[in-house]
A protein has these predicted regions:
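Short alpha-helix plus adjacent loop in nuclease-associated cores
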Residues: 144-204
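RNase H-like, metal-dependent nuclease domains and their acidic two-metal-ion catalytic environment used
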Residues: 1-153, 176, 180, 201-278
Length: 278
């Protein structure tokens, strides 16, 4: 059953533009990616999304969601907690290295978007990314900078080697416009989503038989792949759980549907997804 007309993205739309494929965990030397990061310090989820940016002959530039990671860990008592910020930074920097494999810094990465809201310390994260760093490959890699940010551009002369691919975005300032832009891109079929796993945690590929008939080929992904696809499923659910509402004063806002609220959906996965379409 589909949702109402005011929903951000309908389930039928997500299903229409979903395909079966494995996540990407590194660049093969031919692709270009966008990374987004919605950091958290304590209670929320801290989500990183990776999308491949490519050009379709008919539609032009498109996005394909290829990996999503929630930077949380299990405490000794079994509760979920956000990984400490220094470790988060190390993981994110090494993801930048992975998705730039085969390229000079950072020709394999189109852009990096970070939610600069105060809650997750997004601006602080951006400051940590200014400095050159040694990656897990043992090599020194350039830092990155947002040259348009009113505060970060003050550091430009202090970090001359920083690559200007960083974008610090404030949802507080431009949330409605950002959500509407994402809605338009998805409805136009410019974003490809991964299909979810079946009940046995398998990927289902449609294959054509020699006689022209179609059948299903089942493949069992690894644990990291299962986790990635599961995280992207959560992003899809949050997209479908958001609706446009007009307040009495005429202001347009996007907020969770009553059903999403009753299911205790968050907004951490959707924020990273919104960022990737900016």
């Amino acid at each position: 059953m589909d949702q109402g007309e005011d929903v951000l993205v309908k389930r039928t739309t997500i299903e229409k533009f979903s395909k079966t494929y494995y996540p990407d965990f590194e660049n093969d030397g031919t692709r270009k990616y966008i990374l987004t990061y919605d950091p958290a310090s304590r209670l929320d989820n801290s989500v990183v999304l990776v999308a491949e940016l490519f050009r379709d002959e008919e539609k032009g530039l498109m996005l394909k969601l290829v990996n999503m990671v929630n930077l949380v860990e299990r405490a000794k008592d079994g509760t979920s907690m956000v990984i400490q910020k220094p470790k988060q930074m190390e993981i994110f920097k090494n993801m930048m290295v992975d998705y730039n494999l085969g390229y000079v810094d950072y020709e394999g990465i189109d852009s990096v978007f970070i939610d600069a809201g105060a809650g997750g310390g997004g601006f602080e994260v951006g400051q940590h990314l200014l400095t050159d760093f040694k990656g897990k490959d043992g090599r020194l890699h350039r830092g990155i900078i947002d040259p348009e940010n009113e505060y970060m551009k003050l550091y430009k002369d202090d970090y001359p080697s920083a690559d200007p691919i960083l974008n610090l975005f404030s949802f507080k300032k431009d949330k409605t416009a950002a959500y509407e832009a994402t809605q338009a891109m998805i409805n136009q079929g410019l974003v490809i989503f991964p299909k979810g796993l079946n009940v046995r945690n398998e990927l289902e590929f449609e294959v054509e038989n020699p006689d022209g008939s179609m059948s299903i080929k089942y493949e069992k992904p690894g644990l990291d792949e299962i986790n990635s696809i599961t995280q992207m499923d959560l992003a899809k659910e949050e997209l479908m759980g958001m609706q446009k509402t007009k307040k009495p004063n005429g202001t347009i806002v996007f907020e969770q549907t009553p059903a999403a609220k009753s299911n205790n959906l968050h907004d951490d996965w959707i924020q990273s997804t919104i960022l990737v379409t900016l």
